[in-house]
């Protein structure tokens, strides 16, 4: 728990298992963090589980109970069902627009097709792609970071993609990838200068190494101070409860839209 001075009044923010609790003016508010990752073109249910319609229904039900919701995704929207693949994931992007995603990062499978496809997806999207360690012609591919204000709380959001994408994705050579730890330290410093109250990283790194020596979300939490929450993707890990490394909470939601983290 930590006390924060916002607009001249004291606000206490607590990171708990199921959300961010705010105590303000003797009232308790909760900011719900909903997270997905590695959707992989799962427009329709996989083995009768998930699908965009089911996901949208769940998100709507959560929002009906609490208006303070932050909805994010940790990458790999692309490459899965034929209905998505043949349309360059446009159905997925439109579904994300409908569900009201606040921010998405880029996964390695976003580079399975030429870069112009990803650029089209960014144009279709009504949400930002946060790409703190990917550059194109010397500038961030998407946005370097994002600040969302919810319930009077300033939330800084950054995004990272595994540098191993350079080795496993055929079109990754059209952009450059910065070391994940170096990029995270830099963007956390920038967000602190903006006086955000919480810092969330959308990281397509994985709980386990995709290749020897590459950065995982665990290692990032160990090596970079100042990150409150890491929303992870890439390794398709399933964990029922958040992991806590030092002062950082790590969450992930398996794959293919089977789960929505809350």
Predicted regions and their residues:
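Acidic, metal/ion-coordinating pockets
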Residues: 8, 20-262
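Core hydrophobic alpha-helical membrane-spanning segments
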Residues: 12-20
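N-terminal Sec-pathway targeting helices
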Residues: 1-13
């Amino acid at each position: 728990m930590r006390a924060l001075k916002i607009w001249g009044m004291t606000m206490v923010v607590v990171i708990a298992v199921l959300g961010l609790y705010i105590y303000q003016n003797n009232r308790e508010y909760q900011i719900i963090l909903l997270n997905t990752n590695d959707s992989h073109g799962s427009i329709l249910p996989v083995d009768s589980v998930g699908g965009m319609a089911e996901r949208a229904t769940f998100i709507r039900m959560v929002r009906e109970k609490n208006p303070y919701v932050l909805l994010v995704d940790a990458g790999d929207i692309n490459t899965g069902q034929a209905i998505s693949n043949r349309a360059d994931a446009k159905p997925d992007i439109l579904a994300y627009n409908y569900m009201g995603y606040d921010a998405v990062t880029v996964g390695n499978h976003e580079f399975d097709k030429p870069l112009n496809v990803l650029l089209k997806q960014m144009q279709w999207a009504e949400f930002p792609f946060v790409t703190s360690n990917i550059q194109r012609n010397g500038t961030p591919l998407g946005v370097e970071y994002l600040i969302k204000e919810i319930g009077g709380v300033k939330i800084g959001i950054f995004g990272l993609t595994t540098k191993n994408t350079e080795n496993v994705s055929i079109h990754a050579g059209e952009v450059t990838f910065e070391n994940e730890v170096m990029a995270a330290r830099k963007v956390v410093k920038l967000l602190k200068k903006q006086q955000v109250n919480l810092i969330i990283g959308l990281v397509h790194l994985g709980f386990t190494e995709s290749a020897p020596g590459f950065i995982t979300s665990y290692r990032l939490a160990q090596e970079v101070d100042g990150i409150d929450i890491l929303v992870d993707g890439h390794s398709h890990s399933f964990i029922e409860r958040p992991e806590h490394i030092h002062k950082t909470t790590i969450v992930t939601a398996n794959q293919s839209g089977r789960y929505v983290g809350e």
